[in-house]
């Protein structure tokens, strides 16, 4: 889908150094997790990470250590990223509701970034450093260029449906971020985005049956 292509495009432009590639994969996972379920974000990135790892010549202990660090990093950041935005995880919406009902603090979509995004920006590098030290990834000297190009090089063509999804996603996010300017509730914006996907034929009524409600 569109999200996978975005991830591949970023990975293709990443450094070929193992430590930096791992940080890139963790950052992408955290970012995606801000806009979708934590599990879905990990499910998108983990196959890409595993495909790259499989193409690396097996250098024994160092290869296994890097593989473990990469998988754990993606999994950790799938959870951490959900803290970043109001829709990242249902717990955030519950927190906003309780803050409104019990403390009188009204938070709009963009307000949550003040509380959630700093946590993500601090935690992702800390987890990365922890994994580097624990598994010794810094000592691994492997050129990942060919593995990255092999996984990402031929898969970056957007279909019409993916372009539509990308445009609608950007518009919805921009409307969420500017809620204080136009006054349209985040729920209305989300519903309008979903209806737009139906209008352009990107999703069909039958697709609703495959959603894990």
Question: What annotation goes with each model-predicted range?
Answer:
Residues 2, 58-94, 98-156:
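Juxtamembrane and boundary regions of transmembrane helices in multi-pass small-molecule transporters
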Residues 28-38, 75-87, 175-181:
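Transmembrane alpha-helix interface/packing and boundary motifs in multi-pass membrane proteins
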